[in-house]
Structures are given as C-alpha cells and as structure tokens.
Amino acid sequence: MNLDQFNPGQDEKPLDHLVPGGGMSCILRTIGCVGDSLASGEFESLDENEKKGYHDYFEYSWGQFMAREIGSKVYNFSRGGMTAREYCESFADSMDFWNLDKRCQAYILALGVNDISRALNPEDSMELGELTDVDVKDYHNNKPTFIGYYAQIIQRYQEIQPKAKFFLMTIPRAYDCDETKNALQDRHAQLLYGLADLLEHCYVMDFRKYSPIHDEQFRKTFFLGGHLNAAGYLLSARMITSYLDYIIRHNMDDFKQIGFVGTPYHNAAEPW
C-alpha cells in the first residue's frame, strides 16, 4: 500500500482536488456549523409578481450534505440573515445552542457576509473591529464589534468543549463585488487569520484565496437567484470536506486525540 497519498505534498494547495468520501474529515464525528443562509441551505424564490422569498431547507445545507457523505453528526447552528452579534446576543440562547448535549468535536464558522452588510449600512453601528477587541481570557470583556462577537462564539464553545477544533471560513471572491465591499471582505479574512493565532485549536479555511471565484459561469451553474442552488450546496460540502482533509493531513499531530474530545480521557504522551 502506498501511503504517500496521506502525506502533504510539497506544493499542495487546499482544493487542488476534491477528495472522494471526505478523506480525513471523517475523523470528525460531531460537527457544528455556525453560519447564515449559506449554512442553512437557503433557497430564493420569486413569484410572478417579482416578490422574493427566502427559505431555509436544512437538508440541502452543505452541513447535511457533509453528514451524509462522511457519516458524522452535523448540527445546523445557523439561520438566514445571521450575524455574529445576533448569534451571541439572542439567537444561540433562544435555540439552546450552548447546551452541553450539543457539544461537538469540531465547529465550522461561516459568518461575516451579513456582518459586512451591517458595517456598510450608515444607520448601523456595527464595525468589523480589531484583534485588540478580543480578551482571550474573558469573552465578557470583548468589544461589541464583529470580531469581538465572533471570538465570543469560539470562546463560549471552548468553555463547554475545551479541546474542540474550530475552522474559520473566509468569504469567496465574487466578480461583481464593488471595491468597498471587497476591502471589507479582505479585512474579514485578515481578522480570522489573526484570531486563529490568538485562540487555541483554530484553523482558517481560506475560501477567499483557494475556492473558485463566483463569476458569471459559476453563478449560472450553482446559484438560484442570490443564493446557492442544490448543486451549489453539494459542491460547497465537497469543497469543505476536502479542505478539512487538507488541514488534518497537514497537522496530523493536532488531531491524534480527536477521538478523546468530549470524553474524560486523554493520552498524556501526545499533544492535544
């Protein structure tokens, strides 16, 4: 048997290829997906009077496509329109998402699109913020900015599952994005990289750098109005599991004890 397939290639980049069956992502047996409409399988409808509707179909979410592909339990901690602020201030509590019974070995955070829309709204006080807005010792002291709330989500899940792994998703590039929004999305990515350095067990999934650009052909094939279609959510799931596989293979020591996360056991001879 040739084990080279599991070894990181010298020039390998994330998403160089899609991994059949999810690859090493299968070792993550419980996963929480924290996000907005694109984490919720949201479809956009349009009636004969040009009235739009937005409908979350979680069975079509990339999280549930992942669950079916890799055989893991995947939670949708998400809803269309979600922001980091709303998640912390009301949504997670109202949905009982901090419940110990819903603890996961891994969390994928896909928030920022709606937060940036709020930052662009002159009537909204939301700012993306700075890494200094994060108190790594006490999230109660985090400032009320996007990155302050985003970090709080991680910190609160770390309270209930201290050794969980966190995967932070950047925003893919779109061909029709204006300069101002592009700059904020770039800043969003920079903040996530900085946060991954500040907090333990965090990894960036840089879809902004490595995923296909959402150009006209991509939108024609994988979008339904302003949101993904069913095939688009399936493609997203395949890209996410392949990216997880890449991260795990490039950080094998970090995942040696993933099977003990959420249990009272560990192996003192190995790193977490």
Enumerate the language-model features and the residues they cover:
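Generic structural signal for well-ordered alpha-helices
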Residues: 150-155, 189
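Structural recognition of the beta-strand scaffold that forms the well-ordered cores
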Residues: 32-34, 74-78, 105-110, 165-170, ...
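Solvent-exposed loop/turn segments at secondary-structure junctions
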Residues: 37-40, 79-85, 113-118, 172-176, ...
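Catalytic His-Asp segment of secreted/periplasmic serine-dependent ester chemistry enzymes
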Residues: 171-272
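Serine-esterase "nucleophile elbow" of acetyl-processing enzymes
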Residues: 2-78, 95-99, 249, 253
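N-terminal cationic-hydrophobic initiation segments that often serve targeting/anchoring roles
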Residues: 67, 99, 154-159, 196-197
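Conserved SGNH/GDSL esterase-like catalytic core that processes O-acyl groups on lipids
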Residues: 44-131, 135-144, 148, 265
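Proline-centered flexible-loop/turn and helix-kink motifs
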Residues: 162-163, 200
